[in-house]
Amino acid sequence: MVAYYHDNTLLHESEILHNMENQLLHTPDGVRDIYNGECKKKLYLQDKLHRTLLKYGYHDIMTPTFEFFNIFGSDVGTTPSKDLYKFFDKEGNTLVLRPDFTPSIARSAAKYYIEDDMPVKLCYLGNTFINSSDYQGRLKESTQCGAELIGDGSISADAEILSMTVESMLESGLKNFQISVGHSQFFYGLTKAAGLSGEQEENLRELIANKNFFGVEEFVDSLSMNDKLRKLFGLLDNFDLQDEQLMEALKLAKGYDEILSSIDTLLKLREYLKAYGIEKYISYELGLISDYTYYTGIIFQGYTYGTGEPIVKLSLIHISEPTRH
């Protein structure tokens, strides 16, 4: 019997082989095997969702699993650099496993489509990779099914995507769910009107993202502003704004173009959603913000019971020309 010393411990050959076999049977943290019944259910669900997207006129697109680093750089603001899986090719280029599909699809649209092709409806299904901390307990590889509407910034297009989202959730078998709808420009309009510095804006964003509305209140109290603007800031912690509250917010927003436009868009969107008959699934939340800086319009997230994270995280990108991504 052969013996080896490792970390001052005497190991027999059989123990070493046993340890190696254990390592070969396990996956790294953040990834897992999907097999048997679970795999069958996942494939069935993916097919149901895919059929719904095709029904709404979306066309499949497949983009590479990895891209050049600058595709996912800070300009499009998807995932922090520290959370990207980065590696080098033989030519020394920095490559990244995709953390998100949108930048890749934007690149493809700029390459393959011209303005006359707009609007373009593209859908995708595949895995994304985010190198989150092991302590967060999140999967580092996950499957995304989604759609990108490029070149149509109309409210009717926003409403159609929300209708498609509701239908997708119903097709997946969900009955009890809610979709929170907001607008990215409400937050940016507030920070502009209040004259916040870049650092202050990031501090406020972090407070809102963490749902620390006591902190938001303290932050706002420390600022000098008029009563109208203070009341608009006060709407950030309301998760289900009613019609009369949105109308009151519209009055308060007069004189603040970005804020006014965002609320007016939500009010118009509300009428479209009533026509689709899906208003019971919708709530309005002006405190909803996006992690992605390239999202410029409507934001919405879907929730259901038994999950700690949104099961749908979508935002709409309004692009008038395929080269503007």
Residue ranges and their predicted role:
Residues 7-9, 13:
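Short hydrophobic alpha-helical segments enriched in small aliphatic residues
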Residues 20-39:
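Auxiliary tRNA-acceptor-end handling modules of aminoacyl-tRNA synthetases
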Residues 38-56, 67-68, 81, 102-115, ...:
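Positively charged, Gly/Ser-enriched RNA/tRNA-binding surfaces
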Residues 61, 65-95:
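Polyanion/phosphate-binding surface patch
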Residues 83-89, 196-216, 304:
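Acidic, His- and aromatic-enriched active-site or binding-groove loops in soluble protein domains
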Residues 140-145, 181-189:
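Short, conserved phosphate-binding/catalytic loop or strand-edge motifs used
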Residues 176-186, 204, 283-289:
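Short, surface-exposed recognition loops or helix-turn segments adjacent to catalytic cores
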Residues 188-198, 293-300:
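Short glycine/threonine-rich loop-to-helix capping motif typified by GTGT followed
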